[in-house]
């Protein structure tokens, strides 16, 4: 029997595994995908808002080229930490069941059954997109994750959402020759939009380079058209892709 099993091999899961090992506990980290699997899905050239010292774990310094780390630097860093700490990892092994009580848990995966006294659930919040629940949302043209702008060059792209991820996706697509329309449920962009992003997107909207509908929701999605509920009534726009940057929630 293990002393502790950690479900999830992201930064929090790795930090938990490091602490358990340093306390002399028999620990195991189980991850359904790759190491730091959520980071794999982040935009390819993403830059973190946090500075390196806020992302460090286990006392390992996080060297970066710039003031704020990029996605590939984070992936390299956490892989290096996991290797240096010689953590007991099981990757690409989804947990299918967790049962028991404090002191006696059973963790079932696709490959094995494990017994443990304690469980740390560190699965993050990037697995389950917040759906719009509208007709057509399951079309292939609808994406809940944004990797890079290149597939959307010279197409009509609607970006749904008003937070940082939506703003960054819209600006990236615009700068790669996409015809961008933003659909924002609120009357303005969220208060958490970073100070260097807000004036950029607002200026692009003001000059007409990016179209924007505020106080607006998506009512339906068709292969070539996006239907909207706006303050002025129903509207329809030409559309090739929908980037639904509507946030995420934990998978439990």
Language-model features: where?
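Dinucleotide-binding Rossmann-like beta1-alpha1 core, especially the glycine-rich loop
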Residues: 58, 63-64, 81-85, 91-92
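FAD-binding core/adjacent interface of flavoenzyme oxidoreductases
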Residues: 1-7, 22, 37, 41, ...
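N-terminal FAD cofactor-binding segment of flavoenzymes
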Residues: 15-27, 31-55
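Glycine-rich active-site loop/strand segments that organize a redox cofactor
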Residues: 40-75, 209
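Rossmann-like dinucleotide/flavin-binding elements
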Residues: 1, 6-32, 145-190, 252
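Short, glycine/charged-enriched secondary-structure capping and boundary segments
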Residues: 20, 42-46, 104, 133-137, ...
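A Rossmann-like FAD-binding core segment of flavoenzymes
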Residues: 90-93, 97-99, 104-107, 114, ...
């Amino acid at each position: 029997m293990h002393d502790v099993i950690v479900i999830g091999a992201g930064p929090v899961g790795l930090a938990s595994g490091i602490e358990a090992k340093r306390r002399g506990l028999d620990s195991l980290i189980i991850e359904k995908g790759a190491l730091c699997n959520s980071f794999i899905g982040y935009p390819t050239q993403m830059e973190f808002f946090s500075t390196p010292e806020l992302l460090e774990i286990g006392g390992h310094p996080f060297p970066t080229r710039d003031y704020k780390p990029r996605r590939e630097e984070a992936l390299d860093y956490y892989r290096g930490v996991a290797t240096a700490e010689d953590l007991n990892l099981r990757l690409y092994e989804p947990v299918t069941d967790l049962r028991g009580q404090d002191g006696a848990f059973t963790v079932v995966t696709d490959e094995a059954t494990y017994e443990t006294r304690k469980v740390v659930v560190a699965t993050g919040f990037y697995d389950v997109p917040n759906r719009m629940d509208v007709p057509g949302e399951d079309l292939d043209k609808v994406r809940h994750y944004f990797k890079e702008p290149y597939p959307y060059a010279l197409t009509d792209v609607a970006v749904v959402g008003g937070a940082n991820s939506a703003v960054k996706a819209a600006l990236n697509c615009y700068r790669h020759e996409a015809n961008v329309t933003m659909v924002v449920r609120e009357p303005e962009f969220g208060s958490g939009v970073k100070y260097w992003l807000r004036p950029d997107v607002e200026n692009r909207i003001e000059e007409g380079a990016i179209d924007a509908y505020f106080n607006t929701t998506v009512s339906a999605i068709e292969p070539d058209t996006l239907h909207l509920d706006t303050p002025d009534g129903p509207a329809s726009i030409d559309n090739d892709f929908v980037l639904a940057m509507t946030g995420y929630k934990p998978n439990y």
